[in-house]
Amino acid sequence: MQAAGTVASDNNNWDVTRNADIRAQLYTTGNTVRGAGRQIECTKFMAKSGFAYADNVPVIRKSEMHLNRAEANYQLKNESAALTELNAFKGLRGLPAVDLSGNALLEEILLERFKEFAFEGHRFFDLKRYGRAIVKTVPAVNLSFEDFKILPPIPQREVDGNPNIKQNRGY
């Protein structure tokens, strides 16, 4: 989660929210950043000072509960309940209900998580949970899921204190 400052978006965030999605109002064309031209910025949590992400931001919201429940139900093979939760969430955003099943349902849940939780620190864990590569846009470097940096090192005192704990590879 960003603690302070305005976060620049890549066009991927912009493209998936700019149409009929009310979340498009949370993005603006910002200032020039590091000579890269004007950037798209997320203004989701504006502070009284006028800066994004300068004040306390929500830790959990109703939308997260809907999407967590949708994903959990999908994983429990209860696609009907997953679809109900997903459509309840979409209704809160003024989006039309969908009728999906199988992998298409999971992909829609993950897409809504991508849009809803932009700049809140969720995407990394969503990608990690499903073993998907992490695409970094600044600098333009990709981190494959097999890269040892996907997992942080376990504190050495924990490894030393428990013979059943093995240090994550690469550390």
Segments (PLM) and residue ranges:
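Acidic/polar-rich alpha-helix caps and helix-coil junctions
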Residues: M1-Y171
